[in-house]
């Protein structure tokens, strides 16, 4: 592939949320639907023994929370996806703020019962300052939740951004029936089991007037869905990708990450609309991803990721050109030439040596020099 083709197919984004909104669970299910893992783990579960892929540090497994950003990458339908799962707790917010400088878009997870919470507002302020494109995923619809339109109004008011639902829930809590995808015109039917594999049932319903809708969810919920969709189409403007890319409009999805519902719709739409690697602003000029000279920046240094070794790992975001292993690069601040003999790609704690990396990629390298 050419450099431009490599750039175009990359998507690098962070998942952010207030603590316990389901951020790490959603990340795990995106990995599952993307084919990066075959069985989803859980943050805390008596049924599921496998831990969350992104919570690989011992303290994270003990506490059931994320304390440091984890980076995971996978291929999906021709796109190269890089997910950064960030800490939600305020004590570790600095890690999240640094991570937001290295991503091209963001998915915000909101608990459907609690709505917009304090840490979500703070993180959204950072996104707004950087004009970062935002997608909202309203989670935990399998539990009693606020009404969908109330949640949409709350997101607009509290996060100060226009919204456009691209999926819509059919009830919530004990009567939750599933999610209707307004983007693809299909229905995902809900079952109450915690699914570990990506096998959600999807029914194509291109015309909501079809009697197939009653056959799938019953007369009462079919009538309610038709009314809700009519209201959505009447109240909200059509989805404008340009406004989304400028950080002015947030597409909204509903679902239950732990039960897989709404996750596939989110992933499919994300791959279509999310931005490729964006130009990087510097003190003197804008660096375009397609420039031939390799540039990048270290946005985080993490010590002691491996408990068996005293290590310092630099998280490096590639901004332009092609990164090559064993090639000398100028460290601008020190004026020194640096060579990376064992740069690695991320999959949480797992690592694999890479020979090349392209704009949008997050790589890691051992820090023997001050960077």
Please state what every model-predicted region is.
Residues 1-370:
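Structural and coupling elements of P-loop NTPases
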């Amino acid at each position: 592939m050419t450099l431009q083709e490599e750039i175009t197919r990359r998507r690098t984004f962070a998942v952010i949320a207030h603590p316990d909104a389901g951020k790490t669970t959603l990340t795990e299910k995106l990995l599952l639907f993307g084919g990066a893992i075959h069985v989803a783990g859980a943050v805390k579960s008596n049924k599921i023994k496998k831990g969350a892929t992104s919570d690989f540090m011992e303290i994270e497994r003990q506490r059931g929370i994320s304390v440091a950003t984890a980076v995971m990458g996978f291929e999906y339908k021709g796109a190269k996806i890089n997910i950064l799962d960030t800490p939600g707790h305020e004590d570790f917010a600095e890690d999240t703020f640094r991570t937001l400088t290295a991503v091209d878009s963001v998915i915000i997870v909101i608990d459907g019962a609690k709505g917009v919470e304090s840490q979500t507002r703070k993180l959204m302020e950072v996104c707004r300052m950087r004009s970062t494109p935002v997608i909202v995923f309203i989670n935990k619809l399998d539990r009693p939740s606020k009404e969908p339109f109330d949640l949409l109004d709350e997101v607009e008011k509290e996060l100060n951004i226009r919204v456009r639902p691209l999926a819509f829930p059919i009830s919530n809590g004990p009567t939750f029936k599933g999610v209707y995808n307004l983007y693809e015109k299909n229905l995902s039917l809900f079952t109450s089991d915690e699914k570990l594999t990506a096998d959600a049932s999807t029914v194509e319903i291109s015309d909501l007037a079809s009697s197939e809708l009653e056959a799938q969810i019953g007369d009462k919920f079919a009538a309610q869905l038709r009314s809700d969709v009519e209201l959505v189409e009447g109240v909200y403007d059509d989805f404008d990708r340009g406004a989304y890319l400028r950080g002015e409009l947030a597409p909204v999805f509903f679902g239950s990450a732990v039960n897989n519902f709404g996750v596939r719709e989110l992933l499919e739409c994300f791959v279509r609309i999310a931005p490729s690697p964006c130009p990087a602003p510097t003190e003197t000029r804008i660096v375009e991803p397609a420039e031939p000279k390799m540039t990048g920046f270290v946005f985080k240094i993490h010590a002691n990721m491996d408990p068996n070794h005293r290590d310092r790992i630099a998280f490096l975001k590639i901004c332009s050109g092609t990164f090559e292993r064993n090639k000398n690069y100028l460290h601008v601040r020190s004026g020194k030439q640096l060579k990376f003999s064992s740069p690695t790609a991320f999959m949480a704690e797992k690592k694999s040596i890479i020979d090349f990396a392209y704009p949008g990629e997050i790589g890691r390298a051992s820090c023997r020099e001050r960077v």
